[in-house]
Amino acid sequence: MSTEEQNGVPLQRGSEFIADDVTSNKSNNTRRMLVKEYRKIGRGAFGTVVQAYLTQDKKNWLGPFAIKKVPAHTEYKSRELQILRIADHPNIVKLQYFFTHLSPQDNKVYQHLAMECLPETLQIEINRYVTNKLEMPLKHIRLYTYQIARGMLYLHGLGVCHRDIKPSNVLVDPETGVLKICDFGSAKKLEHNQPSISYICSRFYRAPELIIGCTQYTTQIDIWGLGCVMGEMLIGKAIFQGQEPLLQLREIAKLLGPPDKRFIFFSNPAYDGPLFSKPLFSGSSQQRFEKYFGHSGPDGIDLLMKILVYEPQQRLSPRRILAHQFFNELRNDDTFLPRGFTEPIKLPNLFDFNDFELQILGEFADKIKPTKVAE
């Protein structure tokens, strides 16, 4: 059998096994199927991801799927499966099948989540522009940021917090402009007055309240992550790169100014770390945003300044983000030019809100839809 190296890890093409309990997420029917793994496409904190195909008869193959393998009988496995089983949204990766299998390598049982497969992550797309010393087109940044916010509108409406929003946890198809949030290994349904661990979310995208140890946080930590991802698309690198958790707060203070003592107290009264109370730059925070993100235009700067805010309750909600004027170009022009194309194509459908979304949007629906759609 031939081998291929993906992310430095060789994997035999054609490695296969029989799974006895392959359950369809759509029909709930369970059957015995052959699983043929093709190549490794990712590795996360809670498991690995391979591209694979499924078949009952070795003639009719289903896939390709992105199959995430995580140790069975863990709290994270249980949460991720529960969330993916109910999630049904164009900007959330779709679970197609799930099953368990005893690994011959370590004799442990693994949960396998077979999800739809998209060509690459947003991190890869950002890196491609950086490698070629190019800026990602502003239309693409609008398109991707909008879809992340729309996915969050749905998730947060369910009470689910992703808790690890970053470019490598967002899938994209650059040829169609479609984006889907993936990797729900850290996701959790937040309950009012129920504490959650603060050491969550990858450091560069961690909201300030998490850095100082808040355990009563809200889904607004995802909004902070969205702002970090948007900023990274604009400048080609993570905007806050602290080399350790507390230094991450210093990096944030370089852009936003020092955190308010009230914010510190209400996030975690027991916090006794550095406050970075002295200004780390001259001029205003507005000037700092303009220096770093000026090419996003006044609307882009305005949006970022309303997302990257210390106080969680002051960050824009998903519906207010979707209604922001930064996305007016998506409402006024329904085409974009994919990388490598010579002619523009239609944008993916951005305004086909279902009843659940419309209920959350309320009066904002008419502000978000293009006039011709709203009518």
UniProtKB/Swiss-Prot annotation:
Keyword ATP-binding found: yes
SS bond partners: none
One GO CC term on file: nucleus
Reaction(s) this enzyme catalyzes, per UniProt: L-seryl-[protein] + ATP = O-phospho-L-seryl-[protein] + ADP + H(+); L-threonyl-[protein] + ATP = O-phospho-L-threonyl-[protein] + ADP + H(+); L-tyrosyl-[protein] + ATP = O-phospho-L-tyrosyl-[protein] + ADP + H(+)
Binding site for ATP: 41-49, 68
Posttranslational modification: Phosphorylated at tyrosine and serine.
Name under which the protein is recorded: Protein kinase MCK1
Gene: MCK1
InterPro entries listed in its UniProt record: GSK-3, Kinase-like_dom_sf, Prot_kinase_dom, Protein_kinase_ATP_BS, Ser/Thr_kinase_AS, STKc_GSK3
Organism of provenance: Saccharomyces cerevisiae (strain ATCC 204508 / S288c)
Domain Protein kinase, residue spans: 35-327
GO molecular function: ATP binding; cyclin binding; enzyme inhibitor activity; protein kinase activity; protein serine kinase activity; protein serine/threonine kinase activity; protein serine/threonine/tyrosine kinase activity; protein tyrosine kinase activity
